[in-house]
Amino acid sequence: MNTNSLSRLWIMMRREVWESPFSFKWTPVIVVGFILLFTILALIIGARVDNEMVFTKDGIRQFAEMAVEQRSLLLYGVTISISAIFTQVMFVVVVFYLAGCLYDDRRDRSILFWKSLPISDTMTVASKILTAIVLAPLVYLAGTILIQILIMLIATCYSFLAGVNPFTTFWGPSNLPSMWLLLLFGGLVQGLWLLPLYAWILFCSSWAPRLPILIAVLVPVLIGIFQQFWSFFSDFRFSTENIMLTILERIGRGVVPATIEWDQITDGSERLTRPAEEMFMSYGSVVDSLFSLQMWIGIAIGIVFIVASIWFRKRATDS
């Protein structure tokens, strides 16, 4: 792929964002607003209960007296939890975006206009799947960074009231720039992890006569139910290798930016021995996930669905 093709692909990805402003622009803003609103409401309620903020100030002072490692761990957990909210909202948004992106072109016949342009169907489908696994994580990461900075500014104001240094208490231990780079890397890897699910939904959008999201959900559900019935009536036991369990496991690992590495932080009794930031996410866990067999099997399945989507896209106007 030459530079001209990459430039055209980038323009088409930006077009996807421009045509879906609620999904990729307003939804992150709304999530930021809700988190900020609930944070402010919690502080207001706390101020009404805690007259003159005696307990609040004492709590901040006690937090400042903790070891740096403890403060770093607590702040890391809070910021990762915030990013998890954005990741989960993004997953829902991307699912509905992919379910409608090719189907809507066929429904309103705008596909005729796009096919009249010097843009291949391969490029069109690629722009949509790349928007889901690359551009969407970048947009929602921007929302994550914004709300984290706003909450840290609120914490800074409270630390001044408590008479502690906000930079050594909050900003330093939080190590935000390093965490943002990790979230960026992890978000892109999670996008690849979810590629088979995203590609399946895109595939349904390319051929479904109506309600592609319903078809995308019902087909694996029915297969999973059939698997359970078949295994039960043939072996009188429920199957452990169920397609629905596999999908739910992949979704669970793809929408939560956290990986608890028990082999690194626990002893043989599963008792927490060395709690650290690796409880939530680390470069090691992300790299291990990237080069795992499950990841590459999923990518191969996703490529098959993408190729099938291109095939149906090319024949969408034949009838």
Which residue ranges define each predicted feature?
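Hydrophobic alpha-helical transmembrane segments
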Residues: M1-G100, D105, L141, W193-L195, ...
